[in-house]
């Protein structure tokens, strides 16, 4: 995400296609709230929790929010997915990067919600320093 943010800021990161991929995010303020909740609840002893904002986002959604956070206009065009797929054929390293960028990475914070957690901020609430 930091590289994407830097690339958008400098003007060299390509507009991502809308692939419908699913990614989880959480605002740092909500993450801190989740940590404090778990630290203060005896039911959490020895447990592992995942914290998300409860919404699935596409990489294009994240790209658009980053553009807004940087006060950059959102391009009306995008690099076609097949070009990313072709680039992924060049090497395993590039394939890994393309998969990380356009693949799914979604999680559930349902277990944490049973302790009473509910995210208060959304992806759109994030600004440059949150990424």
Give a label for each model feature:
Residues 5-16, 72:
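A short C-terminal helix-loop "cap" of Rossmann-like NAD(P)-dependent dehydrogenase/epimerase domains
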């Amino acid at each position: 995400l930091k590289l994407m943010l830097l690339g958008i800021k400098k003007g060299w990161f390509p507009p991502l296609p809308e692939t419908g991929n699913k990614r989880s995010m959480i605002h740092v303020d909500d993450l801190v709230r989740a940590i404090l909740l778990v630290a203060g609840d005896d039911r959490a002893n020895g447990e592992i929790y995942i914290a998300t904002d409860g919404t699935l986002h596409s990489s294009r959604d994240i790209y658009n929010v980053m553009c807004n956070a940087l006060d950059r206009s959102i391009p009306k065009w995008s690099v076609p997915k097949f070009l990313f797929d072709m680039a992924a054929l060049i090497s395993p390293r590039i394939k890994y990067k393309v998969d990380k960028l356009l693949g799914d990475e979604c999680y559930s914070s349902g277990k944490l919600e049973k302790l009473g957690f509910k995210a208060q901020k959304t992806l759109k609430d994030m600004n440059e320093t949150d990424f």
